[in-house]
Amino acid sequence: MLGGVGGRHMSTRRRGSSPLVRGGAGLTGYAGPGASGNSNDVAAIPPDMQRYAGRRRRAVTTSDHKSCALVQTRIKLGDIMLAAQEAAQRDPGYASQYRRRPRLAGLSFGDWTSFGGEVPGLVDMAPGRDQGGGAGGGGGGGKGTTSLFILSEDNCIRKHTRFIIEWPPFEYAVLLTIIANCVVLALEEHLPKQDKTILAQKLEATEIYFLGIFCVEASLKILALGFVLHRGSYLRNIWNIMDFFVVVTGFITAFSQGIELDMDLRTLRAIRVLRPLKLVSGIPSLQVVLKSIIKAMAPLLQIGLLVLFAIVIFAIIGLEFYSGTLHKTCYSIRDINVIVKEGEQASPCNTDNKSEAPFGAHVCDANISTCMDHWEGPNFGITSFDNIGFAMLTVFQCITMEGWTAILYWTNDALGSTYNWIYFIPLIVLGSFFMLNLVLGVLSGEFAKEREKVENRQSFLKLRRQQQLEHELYCYLNWICKAEEVILAEERTTEEEKKHILEGRKRAEAKKKKLGKSKSTDTEEEEGDDDQDDGELSSSTKEKGPCKQFWLAEKRFRYWIRKSVKSQKFYWFVIVLVFFNTVCVAVEHYGQPQWLTDFLYFAEFVFLALFMLEMFIKVYALGPRTYFDSSFNRFDCVVISGSIFEVIWSEVKSGSFGLSVLRALRLLRIFKVTKYWKSLRNLVISLLSSMRSIISLLFLLFLFILIFALLGMQLFGGQFNFDSGTPPTNFNTFPIALLTVFQILTGEDWNEVMYQGIESQGGHKKGMIYSLYFIVLVLFGNYTLLNVFLAIAVDNLANAQELSAAENEEEEEDKQKQAQEIEKEIQSLQNPKDGGAPKVEICPPNGKGGKQSSEEEKKQDEDDDTGPKPMLPYSSMFILSPTNPVRRAAHWVVNLRYFDFFIMVVISLSSIALAAEDPVWEDSPRNEVLNYFDYAFTGVFTVEMILKIIDLGIILHPGSYLREFWNIMDAVVVICAAVSFAFDMTGSSAGQNLSTIKSLRVLRVLRPLKTIKRVPKLKAVFDCVVNSLKNVINILIVYILFQFIFAVIAVQLFNGKFFYCSDESKYTQQDCQGQYFVFEDGALLPEPKKREWQSQFFHYDNVMAAMLTLFAVQTGEGWPQILQNSMAATYEDKGPIQNFRIEMSIFYIVYFIVFPFFFVNIFVALIIITFQEQGEAELQDGEIDKNQKSCIDFTIQARPLERYMPKERNSVKYKIWRIVVSTPFEYFIMGLIVLNTVLLMMKFHRQSDAYKNTLKYMNMCFTGMFTVECILKIAAFGVRNFFKDAWNTFDFITVIGSIVDALVIEFGENFINVGFLRLFRAARLIKLLRQGYTIRILLWTFVQSFKALPYVCLLIAMLFFIYAIIGMQVFGNIALDADTSITKHNNFQSFIQGLMLLFRCATGEAWPNIMLSCVKGRPCDAKAGKQEGGCGSNIAYAYFVSFIFFCSFLMLNLFVAVIMDNFDYLTRDSSILGAHHLDEFVRIWAEYDPNATGKIHYTEMYDMLKNMDPPLGFGNKCPNRLAYKKLIRMNMPVDVDLKVNFTTTLFALIRENLNIKVRRASERNQANEELRDTIRSIWPLQAKKMLDLLIPRNEEIGRGKMTVGKIYVCLLILESWRTTRFGQIESAGQPIMELQDVVVSDSRAGSLESLTHTGKRLHPPVQPVRHPSRSPSLRHSPGRPGYDHHGHYYHEGPGFSDTVSNVVEIQRHTHHPHPSQYNHRHRMRGPWSASTSPARTPSPIHHIDRGRHYGTTSLEQRSRSPSPIGGRQPPHTHQHYHRHHPHQHSYPVLVTRRGRGRRLPPTPNKPSTLQLKPANINFPKLNASPTHGSHIHVPIPAGMQHPPPGQHLPPMQPSHCPLSFEQAVAMGRGGRLLPSPVPNGYKPQPQAKQRTPRHSDSDEDDWC
């Protein structure tokens, strides 16, 4: 069937496709003249069938083009298309030929190629292709691909090798070999000094076998595929290149035993581990992850450049300030080679004389040591700023937030602590919080896009397959029906059959519904079909007669049990059981009494029995099948089986290890709660749904770690041998290497490992190259792969929220439906015959009715905040009525304008007072004074509270004082302060209990929070944070639950095993008695110390301790130490043995994946999503989205830029200006900056004097050059204009700073310390930033996100303030000790120090250690005057944990949220207009309006929009019709001078592009009003001034007012009129080539309208001369009324005039350049003059000056010639006024003359096959460039008549030599635009050239 097509092509037919099928040439079945096929067969198909065959062919061939990749490689489709078209033109009959070939009728392209030689015609058609290409069907380039020049395609060896390498078992064998090779590499243990274990020696012997196998594989592939020369050969595949490389290096290592190689080349074999990735490409979810990472690479590179730039700038600043400062340290006076340490490490010093040292610097104790410059520096000398390499590494390390505080403290020691924070804090904020979070934004955007793409693609493929099948089925059915109709016309389907069909359909529908409704979660028991089961039961009962009664009873009993099992009571009973079980597990702890142990032991059995019972009951009630349908039940069953197994096992073999973990899994049963808790359920579902992506990501991560671990083993194995022993993080064995890589991946202490790695390879002199290994690991692992976790989390959470929203909507709908049904029933009951009963509305029509009204009430309450509030109508405190004078006075005071302001001032003053207190010495004079201030402040707040209570009442009625949260807080603070003062005053014994008072006084800290209520925007951010906390509660529950589960497991595993003896040689508490000797460095005798049996600070002895420890691990701080302790843990009450149980690390790895990688990211994701939703929620009322808001924001703030240009053309100033703004000058300066940067980077520590002087003089040269640049610019622009541009001001400051700096260096630095001037050297680099377009946009967005941040920052500042004050009050008096974390650098002894400490904690630097240094029992500071060990407090735990929680989870995530919000355009569809595009508009506008008048002529506006690339402008490929239509919709008003306004144009453009309330013409006024309201509500302040500019009033665009819309409507009508009317007039049978078919210079191509709709168009013999305006202004038409001299127009018979008479006035105003302002040479220019001056050529020579002037300069012109001078000169009366010439109409006169036609030369823009027969033609606008003068059109005086239609008037010739037609056209084609320089340094984007031929405007949408 189907015309004889064989079955073997069915599959191909369904899949194959090609663009060709849709091609115009109709090639679908063409097989060339030689194709086989019997043409008589056609008769065998009935005509109907033929019709279907055609349709069938179309159905089959519209398929996805990707599936025919094979075809694309074998045949170039484009060639065939062209060949087919040529064939069609040569032989018109050919196209119909194929229809008679039934054999090929239904074949798509893919089928021909499967025939190979059967289609000779195909191959012949492709020109320039190998003729033998099709025959072999092979890869590459056809038959000619001989492998290695020897084996042809048909060679049997090659055929067999090809078969082998494509044989699946061969591929698997190779993969297995690779895995085996990796295992061998992993089994090696690396020993110091190249020693080898026996195993390693044996493994080395296997090396040669692997090499052999890989060599064989490579040879086979090379034989089969060829080596490199043709497509598809061996080395054309990236994997093969890698293999080949590995084999070659293998041979080099194998046969280079005698040669000493510096590096073991076996490292390179680790690269082969990448090969299993080939398998990966088949897994869709992995593809999403991989693709999104690869796709993100482009934007990531941009960000990478920005980060690199920041690193270079900071490194150069560091080089200038800190070079060589870290080499001084304290050396002992006794032995000058011994370093005197402070604490555990040596630290830099400044001097050993206290009087000389700056504040905060480290001074050596002069009695025992001296400060000398011999030290290599901290961290083996790697951490330093001695040269640019070290400086960049150090800066990069700071950006990763690891070890940055140590560097800060060292620089403080060396230089004093006054200024260093100014360098480090911006580095952290910009580098870490901003730059690196950008990576996250980009990745999550790409991930979401990629996932959506994959999902869409899958659904599309499904749908398409379904449609194809349906289509085929439909065709077949149609044929069958036809056949049936023909044969059995009288038979019809019987009623019974019909019934059958309908029933079938119903069943299918029911099934579909059921599938759709099934719950998306498996957490609940399947509600199995009761009736179905009963049916089965009854049938079995019937059969068994005798036991009938028993079965019936059993059935009833089972039914009852099933009911009970499904009831809520049973469910809650199980939940309570789970809860008790949880409690029992949680109370277990170290050192518990025996009775508790016994009780827990028996309780375990009881719970196990109960849970087993529950399971059996359920299985009985629901039946095994239904029971096991639910995945939760399956999980339950597994847990119970595990528990039974565990109980038996522990009886048999007690003390066994690790199985107890199974017990902990029972806690997962708590998730049963999700059955009734929707949002939690959806969260769990979304977590489960993201498992797929996460598992694939984990696989990727595992591969990554594996590769780097093997690489690390090869590089650093056996090398980490230091004086202090081998560190725990090393690369000696595979498991430890994996852990080390994993640790670096989490980012914790990666810098320490790097220092050890560099030191092991020869220290900072030789081993610096090895830092690359660690940097790549951090960049790719930590910043890229781990951020994909967050991307996945953000993505899936958004899904979960959508799920919840969708479910809520469904519920609402259901309720509504029910309500409506009830309503209907009631109506039908009530509805009497007369129908007069009233309607009853039970439920308001919109489902959210009730909710909305309450929300509106709330809103109204809130809105009243702005105005003065009316007094509440209730009596206050039952005493004061609303009319009471006291209450009225209080009300008046509280609502005074400045009352709130006054309170704000008092709050700020009291905050300052709090910060100024001295926390150490409580009775210091400063504190005494501040105390009195405090009384005053408290007094003010008390008075405020009393007044408010009098005004509002206390609590009983709505709106009273204590009904608001903020007031409650105020009251608490005031009362606490009052109570503490009372204690103070009385001095009673209670007052002695200082801690009570102190804690009461600490509450004063909350005062700053009062400001939140008073600053609306701050309150909005605060509400957002609170809301996101509400949202986070769900995840918090899941989070705490998981944390709890892990804590329970940890207690089971490590309970009581974290003890150790201070003498490391003892292992038990019994042995750890007495004393031991400690040898100190440099001490002669050992020192005896007492042995102590201690527990580690972080341990797992009970659940609470375990939770705290895990929280610390999860923040990623200090966890390697905890991991080492866990792996060393042996047995309860025994000491540690290093790496005793390495498998314990699995616990931490799993924990890390679940928590930091996943849960914490979900937190971040939730906050981000909430933040974004909040932002959008504000806009919902106005019905505009975020992007639209940011664009309107931009418009409101945008102002036109002023571009300066000297007036006198011949002045020196003008010449200087020309130089300064020229492109070469810009590039020269850029080059200087780059060279200067390189010069700055060349400095290094301990450089020779000659080198130093060379650098100094070169620096002076550069300073000189920049000074010259500055002077030139000031000369060119004038002082005022120069400083208008921010960049110039910046340049000027930089230059002045550099000059002063140079002078200081030259004439000695003694007279003033100007170190900061060195900053100016680095500042020049910043100028580089304004060059690149992408960087410019990135920076712009950066600034935007800073604008969005102030309130977020304020909130963070408040958080820091409050915590710093609490820290000062509670921990301020702890003694400083270099051995703990409370040191002179890091403490709470002043407010500033406290802030620094908190900032350090926020970046996560060793916060657990600080927390442990603040707990109870710490030594006190000497000034505090307290007993020893009485300082510190256990509040420290809550204090630090809460701070870290708020900081790292909430606050810093707000940064991330803001950044992701602002930078979403990086991954958004680039065709959507965003605020970041709008800068370009302001820039280009300035070129048309240099004086920043804010207005330009509407034709210039058209030009400008055509010159701007989409999405902002129209682009120069946009057909004019479409541009007109857009302008008509934009419809800006035009003023008297026909100019449009800047703001109005920009807003109209945005509105048109983003579709902001764009409606039909009839509804436009209403839409405008709505938009005005929206703008008033969102921008109340700006709306007053700007509203009429943004949205012009109806009066401005109504009747009698001129608008852009009206002008272009006329042009559009005119155009349509010409096409219809002219099209009917035949002119000698030859179409005339229209003006528009001539090529136009690219930039102005847009300014000529294309009028061709059909390919040929006819014109009347005479066409009026084209008007030379700047862009399409209105044209004259033949029937157009002329003008008389005074503006009265006369008619010439009915023409187009009736249609467009209302726009006649425009023509009179269309302007021309000012003739009077050019010298004679310019004035006499004819229409074709070769001058490139700004006037728009051609133009009539003589003009009349009407006194209007419009002086603008376009800076994007071809010309370098002068622009008009003297913008406001009085008009000259022109002497040529009365000499009119007959070609006043500005259209070219095209007259057809037979026999004298010439063909136009071929043109790139618009190839045209039409012929042109011109006489002398006046072509305007061939070389158009933006004008500088106003256009004035001279009307024809009344006496002049239009030329009669037949008569041809010779055009005016130019006064110099005439040009031939070809010359003119050539000149026009040469009119290319050269971008001219602009003063501001921006470069116009190069316009994309138009390549594709454009045949007509009908395909408008493809152009814009």
UniProtKB/Swiss-Prot annotation:
Query: Does the keyword Acetylation belong to this entry?
Result: no
Regions of biased composition (Gly residues) lie at 23-35
Q: What stretches of residues are IV repeats?
A: 1214-1470
Q: Where are the I repeats?
A: 155-447
What segments bear the compositional bias annotation Basic and acidic residues? Answer: 1682-1691
Which residue ranges are assigned to the Extracellular compartment in the record's topology?
A: 188-205, 260-264, 323-419, 588-602, 650-658, 717-769, 915-930, 982-994, 1053-1141, 1251-1255, 1303-1309, 1368-1431
Region listing for Disordered, in residue ranges: 1-45, 513-543, 827-869, 1652-1694, 1710-1788, 1870-1904
Q: Which domain of life is it from?
A: Eukaryota
Can you say where the II repeats lie in this chain?
A: 554-797
Q: Where are the residues marked Calcium ion selectivity and permeability as a site?
A: E402, E748, E1117, E1405
What is its membrane topology?
Answer: Multi-pass membrane protein
- For this entry, the protein name equals Voltage-dependent calcium channel type A subunit alpha-1
Which species is the source of this protein? Apis mellifera (Honeybee)
Q: What is the organism lineage in this UniProt record?
A: Eukaryota, Metazoa, Ecdysozoa, Arthropoda, Hexapoda
